[in-house]
Each structure stands twice: as C-alpha cells, then as structure tokens.
C-alpha cells in the first residue's frame, strides 16, 4: 500500500459537510491534479446516500472537467473498507448453511480485469443478456463486502445481500463504460442505495423517508464528533449550530430517529417481567380513585332512591347517569310522553329535593 493511499484512509471527513460540499471538493482537487482515484472517491462519499441522477451527474462533471479516474498505485480494486475478496462473516454474526453455501458459491466466480469489464459492457450495449449475467456474477462479492457495513441496522445479513444484489443489477443495466470509471466504483453507489432504501423501508417499525435517513445519519455524525470534542453529550443548540439548523428542527429529527420499543420487551434477569408492566396507564384510574368512585355510586343510588320513580328516571336521563349520554328536555319528554316544560319542572323539583341537607350532606364529601 502506498503512502498516498495511507494518507487518504486516515483523513478525517468533516461531518458537517453536505454531499454537494464533498463533491465540489473532489472536483476542485481533480481539476487541480488532473485525476482522482476510485478509492478516494469511495472514501469521501461513503457516508452519503446518492440516487441515480446524483451519481450520473457527478461522473458527468468529472468527464466535463477532463478529470481522469485512476487506481491507487499498488492498491487492490477497492480499499480495505470494501474488499470483495473478503467473504468472511461480519463480526458477531453467525451465518447459517444457506448463507455459507452462497458465499462459497460466489467465491468460485473469477473477478474481472478492467479490459474484461469493458468488453462485457460493450456486449451489454448490444443487448447481450449473457454478458449482463457475467458482469453481475463477477461483482457479487462486492455486494457482500458492502452489505457487511450495514449489519446491525435492523435487517438480516442475507436480506442485506439480496437488496444489494438488486442494486447491482441496476448498475449493470445503467453502466456506461465510455465515461472512463470502473464498474465497481459505479456499482458501489447503486448497491449502497438499494441497501439503505431497504433499511429505511423495512428495518423500522415506522417508515422514514430516504431523504430523512440521510439527514439523521448526518446528525448522528455531527453528534458523535461533538461528543468527542466536548467530552459530553452536545445540546440541540450546539448540534444545530454545526448543521445550520434551528434547535427545534434538531429536536424534531432526534425524535424521528428514535426506535420504537416493544412493550413486550423482557425486563430483569429472569425475563419474567415485561417493559409494559412498569409503564403507567395515564387513562386508568388509580386504586384510590376507583374506590372513591364506587363509593360515590353507592351513595348516589341511595339518594336517588329517596325520589319518586319519575323524578329519579328524569335525572338519570338528563345527566346520563347510566350510559354517560345526557339528553335534552325534548328527548326526555318524548320518553315520558309529556312536554319539555313538564320535564323541566320535574327536574327542578328533584334537584331541590337533593339540595336538602338530609340528602346533600351524604354527597358533600365527594365534591372536592
């Protein structure tokens, strides 16, 4: 590995830079030096989600500015972070037989030279389906290498590989060898895009738009950088200052980024309790309130029993004592077959009786 390559790998990327900022930096450097390496492009853009238009536009800009894409001297086809020759399982991930067989199978497929890629691309332009399959098969290792970087984000390793393969197929269909860049460089963005979109769509209980996923990822990078610089968790105001966002927007993004937690999550060493057991139901009555309510019902029933049947039933309907639905004077009048004025008179008489100290004192303690 050359000294220049080591320098590229150790450079730190300002987490506050936008995709356009980084693309401009690359183009400015390419215009100055006349070339850019595939490895440097991959390193600089690795944290951004680029759609097909952005990818094609970027490579078009490189061509328009006569910037040549080259390999790092003495480097492999990709840097150490994306190594298609490494088909081992990601750290901490146990692979089952189907995955092991798949990795073994794609490991038998020979990688392509730059000239072979061009020859296949020419045949693909002519509609050769066999050439499409050959180019895709030769880059399945690349998908595995990229998929490893997304393990632990809510999707199984094999699912990540399958989504990445879909991105690889799109890259095969859209690759334009005449622009001068390697297929692996171009395919990397398609593979990453397919995987990140799948994570946004499938891995979260609540779906987050892809553009918001990129914003969340950027915020997390800024948050981690500030944590290192400050030695403490940064405040929303500090994050907002770095990202040029108001604190309210930062709080909103942080809230969106939170993952839902199941109420069935086991709690304790014995896993005999669940998270939901320790969360208060704000709508449920406390035992003391429930006891007081039941006692009030008993006292109210006793007081109503001192009225005539008609007076009691009128109050029950007017105040919804039985079903919680209050009725108008007219509605109650229809029930008893009398006028609304007559119901008003019965209600007034019944309430006067309830206000008598002999009855009201029994309910007075419940008025607080």
From Swiss-Prot:
Location (main, coarse): cytoplasm
Region (Sigma-70 factor domain-4) location: 303-356
Gene Ontology molecular function, alphabetical: DNA binding; sigma factor activity
Keyword Transmembrane helix found: no
Spans annotated as Sigma-70 factor domain-3: 214-290
One Pfam match: Sigma70_r4
Placement of sequence motif Interaction with polymerase core subunit RpoC: 159-162
Any one GO CC term of the record: cytoplasm
Region entry Sigma-70 factor domain-2, spans: 135-205
Gene Ontology BP, a term: DNA-templated transcription initiation
Domain of life, source organism: Bacteria
Record function comment: Sigma factors are initiation factors that promote the attachment of RNA polymerase to specific initiation sites and are then released. This sigma factor is the primary sigma factor during exponential growth.
Family per similarity comment: Belongs to the sigma-70 factor family. RpoD/SigA subfamily.
Complexes and interactors: Interacts transiently with the RNA polymerase catalytic core.
Stored PANTHER family: RNA POLYMERASE SIGMA FACTOR RPO, RNA POLYMERASE SIGMA FACTOR RPOD
Protein name: RNA polymerase sigma factor SigA
């Amino acid at each position: 590995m050359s000294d220049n390559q080591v320098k590229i790998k150790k450079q730190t990327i300002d987490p506050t830079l936008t995709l356009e900022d980084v693309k401009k930096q690359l183009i400015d450097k390419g215009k100055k030096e006349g070339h850019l390496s595939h490895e440097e492009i991959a390193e600089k853009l690795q944290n951004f989600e680029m759609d097909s238009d952005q990818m094609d536009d970027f490579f078009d800009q490189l061509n328009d500015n006569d910037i040549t894409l080259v390999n790092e001297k003495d480097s492999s086809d990709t840097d150490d972070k994306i190594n298609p020759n490494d088909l081992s399982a990601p750290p901490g991930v146990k692979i089952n037989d189907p995955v092991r067989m798949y990795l073994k199978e794609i490991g038998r497929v020979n990688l392509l030279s730059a000239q072979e890629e061009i020859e296949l691309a020419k045949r693909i332009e002519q509609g050769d389906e066999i050439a499409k399959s050959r180019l895709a098969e030769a880059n399945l290792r690349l998908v595995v290498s990229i998929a490893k970087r997304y393990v632990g984000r809510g999707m199984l390793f094999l699912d990540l590989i399958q989504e990445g393969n879909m991105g690889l197929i799109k890259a095969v269909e859209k690759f334009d060898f005449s622009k001068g860049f390697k297929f692996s460089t171009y395919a990397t963005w398609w593979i990453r895009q397919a995987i990140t979109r799948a994570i946004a769509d499938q891995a979260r209980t609540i779906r987050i738009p892809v553009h918001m996923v990129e914003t969340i990822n950027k915020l997390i990078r800024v948050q981690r950088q500030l944590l290192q610089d400050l030695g403490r968790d940064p405040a929303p105001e500090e994050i907002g200052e770095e990202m040029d966002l108001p604190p309210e927007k930062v709080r909103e993004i942080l809230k969106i980024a939170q993952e839902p937690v199941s109420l069935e999550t086991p709690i304790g060493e014995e896993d005999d309790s669940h998270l939901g057991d320790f969360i208060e139901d704000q709508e449920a009555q406390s035992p003391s309130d429930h006891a007081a309510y039941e006692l009030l019902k008993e006292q109210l029933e006793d007081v109503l029993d001192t009225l005539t049947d008609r007076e009691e039933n009128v109050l029950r309907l007017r105040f919804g004592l039985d079903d919680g639905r209050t009725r108008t004077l007219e509605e109650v009048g229809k029930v008893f077959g009398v006028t609304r004025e007559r119901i008003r008179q019965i209600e007034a008489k019944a309430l006067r009786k309830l206000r008598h100290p002999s009855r009201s004192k029994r309910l007075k303690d419940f008025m607080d």
